Each structure stands twice: as C-alpha cells, then as structure tokens.
Amino acid sequence: MSSKNPSADEPESERPERGPTDHSYTAHKIHQNGRDIYYTTIPIDDLFPYSFVERFCENPEQGYQRRYDKRRALDIAQYLATEGESIPSNIVLSAQAIAELTYTRKSKQLNFQRVPEALAVIDGQHRLWGYHLCKLRHRVPVAIYSGLDQATEARLFLDINTKHKGVPKELLKNVK
C-alpha cells in the first residue's frame, strides 16, 4: 500500500479529503494467516472498469490467468439473467497500490479509488465478464486482498484452481 494511505485504525474525521473517484462499501475484514481479506458486494459498474487480468498468453513473464473465453462469459451472463438463478461464490481480487485501499473498522467502510487497474482479478475473470455482459446490473460478491505482490497473487490463483476437489460424476448424476 502507498505510504499516503491513512491507517485502517485512524478515525474518519482525521483522514484527508478523498477525491471524487473514491468508492465506499460496507465490508467485513478478516485476518487469515497473515493476510487481510475484505468481503463485500460491489455493483458491477463500480467494479468492472477498474479491474484487470494478468493473462499468461498476453504476458508470459508476469501473467498467470487463463485465456479469456467469451462463450463461457456469455453463458454466465445468460445464467445470471435467468429468473431465480444466482452465483453465490465471490470473485477474488487483489487491491493494487494505486487503489489506495483503506478500511475503517468502526464504520466497517472499505474505500478504494476508481482508477484503471486498481483491482487485479485473482479468480473469477469469467464470472466478472458474465456480470458485465448481463443485461441486469447485479451487485457482485467479492473478496479483496490487500498487500499482495504479484508472485503471491499467482500462487493464490494456482491454489484456488488446483487444490480443490471436483464433484464425483456419480454424485452429479444423483443430484441432477
């Protein structure tokens, strides 16, 4: 985080004026294994323009995400537009220094600057695109990490996408 950021414990009245690009959301902060994670929901139009993805195919030295699959994103958008359907799982993000992410414990307010590339998508790029392409303007459940370097973001992406166990085919047949 930028050294210009006020402390998360600093009272709001002592914080410097924020610019018109500042966004504030009610959030819950947890500290897990040395990492701060903030859980909230953000309207897609406040999230999508300020998020970015480091794709391996576009940047082999620093990228770690899969190639964008428009068909998959459109399928998600169609699903989200269907009455009674929802996606409860969150999109995992990493606040970049430019986001100037701050959290006020007393009011449970999470703030970040609306600037390009403020939030790196660690997991959920196709869900994010699906929300963006959907004709309905949903609020998106997110988990936002702060203070991660790019190597940690990549490791977290790999952990999320390789260490979970899929549902056995037999169980899928029974549930359907």
Provide a role label for each language-model segment.
Residues 3-11, 65, 84-89, 93, ...:
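Basic- and aromatic-enriched surface patches that contact anionic nucleotides/nucleic acids
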